[in-house]
Regions:
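Short, surface-exposed, charged amphipathic helix/loop patches that serve as local interaction elements
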Residues: 48-132
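Short, charged/polar N-terminal "headpieces" of proteins
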Residues: 1-63
Length: 132
């Protein structure tokens, strides 16, 4: 059981390291619903100022995620990912929000995808709580 806990903590640490390298900071996991991540993303806005902007993304059901990722058009996938996962700020659900910073858009899509695929990384003792 100790080894499993250590592996989970290592995965968590690796995930957080990946995020740091993508200009993401202050990551907080929220157990609401299927899980949510709150974080700050360094990005350039329409005002040409580069600041840390707060975001909240929420995990969706596996069925919903697979329907989104089955699209063939990458732009359509990106738009649907933003609209489906971003809870706050609401204006970030529109791809136009990222017009001045394509790197921030790619980072957001990567964070969404990574979080969706690794839902329990942030829940300490998840296996113990489920009786495993």
């Amino acid at each position: 059981m100790e080894n499993k806990k250590e592996q989970q903590e290592l995965k968590n640490k690796e995930f957080l390291e990946k995020l740091k390298n993508k200009n993401v900071s202050n990551v907080i996991f929220k157990p609401d619903g299927l899980g949510a991540l709150e974080f700050d993303l360094m990005m350039t806005g329409k005002d040409f100022k580069t600041i840390e902007r707060p975001f909240r993304i929420e995990r969706v059901s596996t069925d919903t995620f697979f329907k989104l990722s089955s699209e063939k058009d990458e732009l359509a996938i990106g738009k649907k990912l933003l609209n489906t996962f971003i809870a706050q700020p609401a204006e970030a659900r529109d791809i136009e929000f990222f017009n001045m910073d394509q790197e921030a858009l790619l980072t957001m899509v990567n964070v969404i995808t990574e979080f969706q695929q690794t839902p329990f990384l942030f829940i300490k003792n998840f296996g113990e709580n489920k009786g495993n």
